């Protein structure tokens, strides 16, 4: 949700010689409703090795956020390497050629900052936030972590134990297990989209230092990296620091993967001691580069966003079947998911599933409530505009757009397309969800009664 480009020429001769395809973007999301001081601009540039720079100037903020996004995650792993992106991210903080683990922490905290990271299906990201004047130092620190991590063997042995504890927490949580099984039901085990980001215990125990070095050398290349900053920015200082830190990074080739094929089906896991049945059910949705995904986003908001939505009103308020239930979409670079989830008492799980099916059929067969559709549009609009005011959300969204689309989306164009989705298109979404040719994916975890399992197997038949 970001603006289109307008021409920009950098001022520094050094930056001019090392950057290309540089643009300025006006990202004021509504000049009629925003104070002028809150308007923002976005600049894009590319180093000679293909690494992209993204700068979102937010002059009213007192701090600056910096992230390095790498286009590699669990989607880019073979079954044998499943989990290695997550391990590399953990180990990146354990030392470089010039900094040990403690020195990384001290150098960040001496600036009042804190480094962090996360691994996702389609990317890995490293973050730091602090004072604007320290941005060049932040660039140098994250570059050292990304480019020069040494993955010490003794640290790897210790970190295995930490990740084993992470596995235990994950496997004790019905919500986490339900979503892991849901992905497996959607895409099967043969495609990386159906495998968990955390990997497998066997893989984590087998990976050695050579595996991590080889993976980072292959995947962490300039054509797969975006260095992104948001806050009150001196663009030339940011560009010079990035060029100095990253210009020697090998260009490499884009990390590409094939789109998964939807499978559907039922997965269940009984977990001793659980007092809840966690249900996740969903359907195939378009990927980010297909604008028809907007109708799915609007349909999900209509059905299950907010306490007044039909899903929460029926499931929680009228029937008391679940404390938490929601309908969302996960629109990714290769595929999307239309997801309904809920935590319910085991004795009520069967009724919960039946009620969800009835709501979907009601929206597929009947008319779409105009008031509810208007409510959903407003909720999505406010959510999108609020995200523009949050640096970390802005950077994450922009990086995903650049990796997936190759350009940034203009907020007003995205919102205009959302407004243009008709009630008929939303109803068609619900009708397609119930198409037996593309069966639902369903996962139940926790305390799973036999009747709920049987009901799930017969849903949407």
Model-found features: residue ranges?
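Short pre-active-site segment immediately N-terminal to the catalytic Zn-binding motif
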Residues: 73-81
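Short, surface-exposed, low-complexity cationic segments
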Residues: 61-72
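Charge-rich, well-structured scaffold segments of protease-associated domains
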Residues: 8-11, 15-29, 46, 101-260, ...
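Active-site SXXK
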Residues: 83-96
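N- or domain-start disorder-to-order transition segments that initiate the globular core
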Residues: 24-63
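His/Glu-based metal-binding/catalytic segments typifying zinc-dependent metallopeptidases
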Residues: 67-69, 253-310
């Amino acid at each position: 949700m970001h603006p289109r480009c307008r021409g920009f020429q950098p001022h520094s001769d050094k930056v001019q010689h090392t950057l290309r395809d540089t643009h300025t973007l006006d990202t004021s999301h509504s000049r009629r409703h925003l104070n002028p001081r809150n308007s923002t601009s976005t600049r894009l540039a590319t180093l000679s090795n293909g690494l992209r720079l993204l700068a979102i100037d937010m002059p009213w903020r007192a701090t600056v956020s910096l992230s390095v996004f790498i286009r590699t995650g669990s989607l880019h792993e073979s079954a044998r390497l499943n989990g290695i992106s997550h391990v590399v991210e953990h180990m990146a903080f354990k030392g470089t050629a010039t900094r040990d683990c403690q020195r990384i922490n001290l150098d960040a905290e001496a600036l009042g900052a804190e480094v962090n990271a996360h691994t996702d299906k389609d990317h890995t990201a490293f973050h730091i936030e602090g004072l604007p004047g320290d941005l060049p130092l932040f660039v140098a620190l994250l570059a050292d972590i990304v480019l020069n991590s040494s993955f010490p063997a003794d640290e790897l042995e210790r970190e295995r134990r930490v990740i084993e504890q992470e596995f235990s927490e994950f496997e004790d949580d019905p919500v986490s297990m339900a979503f892991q099984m849901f992905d497996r039901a959607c895409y099967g085990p043969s495609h990386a989209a159906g495998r968990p980001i955390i990997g497998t215990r066997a893989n984590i125990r087998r990976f050695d230092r050579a595996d991590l070095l080889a993976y980072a050398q292959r995947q962490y290349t300039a054509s797969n990296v975006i260095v992104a900053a948001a806050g009150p920015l001196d663009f030339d200082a940011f560009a010079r620091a990035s060029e100095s830190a990253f210009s020697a990074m090998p260009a490499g080739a884009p990390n590409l993967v094939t789109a998964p094929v939807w499978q559907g089906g039922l997965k269940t896991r009984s977990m001793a001691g659980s007092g809840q049945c966690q249900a996740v059910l969903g359907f195939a949705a378009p990927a980010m580069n297909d604008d028809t995904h907007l109708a799915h986003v609007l349909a999900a908001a209509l059905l299950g966003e907010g306490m007044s939505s039909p899903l929460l009103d029926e499931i929680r308020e009228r029937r008391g079947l679940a404390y938490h239930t929601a309908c969302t979409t996960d629109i990714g670079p290769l595929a999307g998911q239309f997801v309904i989830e809920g935590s319910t008492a085991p004795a009520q799980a069967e009724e919960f599933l039946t009620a969800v099916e009835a709501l979907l059929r009601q929206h597929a067969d009947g008319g779409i409530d105009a008031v509810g559709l208007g409510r959903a549009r407003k909720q999505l609009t406010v959510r999108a505009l609020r995200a523009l005011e949050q640096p970390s959300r802005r950077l994450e969204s922009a990086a995903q757009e650049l990796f997936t689309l190759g350009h940034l989306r203009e907020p007003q164009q995205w919102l205009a397309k959302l407004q243009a989705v008709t009630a008929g298109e939303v109803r068609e979404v619900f009708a397609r969800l119930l198409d037996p040719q593309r069966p639902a994916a369903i996962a139940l975890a926790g305390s799973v009664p036999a009747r709920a399992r049987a009901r799930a197997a017969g849903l949407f038949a």
